Regions:
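A short acidic/histidine/glycine-rich donor-binding loop in glycosyltransferase catalytic cores
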Residues: 111-117
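Conserved catalytic-core segment of nucleotide-activated headgroup transferases in glycan assembly
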Residues: 1-52
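A structural micro-motif
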Residues: 19, 37-39, 68, 94, ...
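Short amphipathic alpha-helix with an adjacent loop that forms part of the alpha/beta core around
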Residues: 49-53, 124-131
Length: 177
């Protein structure tokens, strides 16, 4: 939560007034936070404890310097990285808000488990259009994905695909000899 990695968090004076951020983690520089009344800092919790006690309606996957986009080294890294916080938020049964250009944005869209945005400034409009029914459909899908994560479904699927690929490659290599 340090300033260099999450500078956008420290610009809460630009936060739409109906938002309230509930933040968990280490390294927050509280003296740099603007408009603290829209912000709750809950400190660090181990993953298992966070999963059972998190407060909120969405998990925000956003890093970098700016509200306008995930910029800077940390923000740009979201284009390539699959951040742990996505899985953590899913395990917490929280639909996601993620940068449109993040590596995981296509998965979020395909599974309909969150909202993809280019800028945090778009969020008000997206949330205003979201019906209660739409939110609970998203949340239900998140719970389905969470259940799959909890039993290692995605790991097993990736491992099976890797073994099939390597086995196919070995057979092809043997045919050349």
């Amino acid at each position: 939560l340090g300033y260099n990695k999450n500078r956008f968090l420290y610009e809460l004076d630009r936060l739409p007034r109906q938002w309230h951020l509930s933040v968990y983690g280490k390294g927050l520089e509280a003296d740099k936070i603007l408009n603290k009344e829209y912000f709750s800092y809950n400190g660090f919790l181990p993953a298992d404890q966070l999963i059972s006690s998190v407060q909120g309606d969405f998990g925000l996957v956003w890093d970098g310097d700016s509200y306008e986009a995930c910029t800077g080294n940390y923000g740009e890294y979201l284009r390539y990285n699959n951040p742990h916080k996505v899985s953590l938020y899913v395990r917490c049964h929280l639909p996601l808000i993620i940068w449109e250009k993040a590596a995981l944005a296509p998965f979020i869209k395909e599974k309909e488990i969150g909202i993809c945005i280019n800028s945090l400034e778009e969020l008000d409009g997206k949330l205003e259009k979201l019906t209660v029914d739409d939110y609970f459909k998203m949340k239900s899908r998140v719970i389905e994905i969470s259940n799959l994560l909890s039993v290692g479904y995605f790991f097993t699927k990736a491992l099976d695909e890797a073994v099939k690929f390597l086995t196919k490659s070995d057979v092809a290599d043997e045919g050349r000899n």
